[in-house]
């Protein structure tokens, strides 16, 4: 059986970089990437960033006390469009970590061209109660040391 691997990101100069190829399904009637899809690309990069740190999000969902990160706030600035077949780089950098939250700065680039910037705040919550929880120390150490 052929082994299939997921797209790999990489750490470089304190940031995590994840590649995204633009497919026809990502574009709108005007032939450019539909604006909401940039949030999907950013989510994929954040997920792979956490995975690259050795953290499986599924473990938090299967634990007795289910917990995980949810988006609390997002600011996005669209500077230039991406189009079909572009290969983009989505970066993820932790800029602030609090007791129960973290702020990340993300950039989406095509080569050297900056297309989109995103600043996003995530909060660690108990999934059943939807209440904030302190980020576990071992997880906090991993995300601050990235």
Region locations from a protein language model:
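Catalytic strand-loop segment that frames the active site of acyl-thioester-processing enzymes
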Residues: 2-48, 52
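HotDog/MaoC-like acyl-thioester-processing domains
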Residues: 2-10, 16, 81-84, 95-146
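Residues that recognize and position ribonucleotide moieties
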Residues: 16, 31-32, 67-69, 133
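Hydrophobic residues in beta-strands and at strand termini
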Residues: 20-24, 78, 124
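Residue-level signal for pocket-adjacent positions within structured domains
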Residues: 22, 64-65, 130
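Short alpha-helical segments used as structural interaction elements across diverse proteins
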Residues: 37, 43, 69, 127, ...
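Hydrophobic beta-strand-centered segment that forms part of the acyl-chain substrate-binding groove
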Residues: 49-89, 93-96, 101-102, 115-117, ...
């Amino acid at each position: 059986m052929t082994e299939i691997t997921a797209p790999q990101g990489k750490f470089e100069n304190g940031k995590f970089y994840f590649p995204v190829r633009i497919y026809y399904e990502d574009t709108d009637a005007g032939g450019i990437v539909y604006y909401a899809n940039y949030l999907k690309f950013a989510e994929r990069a954040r997920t792979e960033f956490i995975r690259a740190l050795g953290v499986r999000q599924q473990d938090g969902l299967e634990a007795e006390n289910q917990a995980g990160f949810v988006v609390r706030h997002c600011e996005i600035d669209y500077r230039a469009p991406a189009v079909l077949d572009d290969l983009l780089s989505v970066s993820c950098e932790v800029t602030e970590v609090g007791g129960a939250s973290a702020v990340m700065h993300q950039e989406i680039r095509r080569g050297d061209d900056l297309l989109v910037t995103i600043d996003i705040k995530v909060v660690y919550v108990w999934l059943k109660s939807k209440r904030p929880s302190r980020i576990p120390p071992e997880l906090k150490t991993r995300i601050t040391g990235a």
